[in-house]
């Protein structure tokens, strides 16, 4: 079991490393400057975290937070920023040109394979890999950027699944977290692909930066496990009042509401409303997802009110129960002594005449 945990921890971090290096390679291909390979140095933080986790935690995760996913975000997000900001090559050429290029690449690929039949098998594999890489480098840049976005979100979900769980989360809670991540990733991908496609957005560098900042901000929810962790509240919390009981009893729900309102749906709604009102970018999908974000925010706030009312009702019922219990005890303490006194007095009243006029056998048979 320990070996499997160790293997999962190491394999997941290697996948993060490879995907990050692919992103750095795309940046160097687009910018045509080898100095962008320095972005690969960000992976040194992931190397350090891997070594420390394998040595001190035996590959197991941490409670409430995943450093591996956070460092993976640090290593891949700058590459995606540079690819999105390099919008000069974001638009593909015409279909005819692309088709002719694909045909010529297929012919070159077949010729390469034919010429390599006379060489060794190792050389054949090397040449095939070179041709494959060359074909990848000629793919439309817009397709490459979208593909990196898609694989990035998939890596976050799969990596969170494969990483060993920490001590504060169960497998049932992990499955809930992964289901939440699937819906979140779909919304984030739609947000970036829908907004950055618009020509009006591309013509405004400030708006592009704002969208990328909101996108980066929304990614910070993936390293967190707080939205599914239930905290056991001690009995003393009830005596502290409403705030303590509210934040303790519904901590997971409050984190979920906060993430939705302040990290994802709330900021997404603001950006979409700005696009529709100020930049006059209106289409069917933009209106639909803006309405969806609005409904989610309203429903989350409604849920917050429902939870607050539930806690207040619980505290009120507990206080009424305590008052009723104290009242019963007070009535019992007041009525108890009088009843005992009455019983004692009745016993004494019956005993006095018996002591004052004792009955003897002679008196019982006396005749006047």
From Swiss-Prot:
Keywords tagged on the record: Glycoprotein, Membrane, Transmembrane, Transmembrane helix
InterPro entries recorded: Transmembrane_26
Gene Ontology CC entries for this record: membrane
Transmembrane segments: 4-24, 36-56, 65-85, 150-170, 177-197, 208-228, 257-277, 281-301
Superkingdom as given in the UniProt entry: Eukaryota
Tagged with keyword Glycosyltransferase: no
Protein name per the record: Transmembrane protein 26
Region ranges (Disordered): 324-368
Location of this chain's protein in the cell: Membrane
Annotated glycosylation sites: 110
Source organism of the structure: Homo sapiens (Human)
Principal subcellular localization: membrane
Start-end of Polar residues biased regions: 330-341
Membrane topology type: Multi-pass membrane protein
Gene that specifies this protein: TMEM26
Cysteines paired by S-S bonds: none
Keyword Transmembrane helix included in the entry's annotation: yes
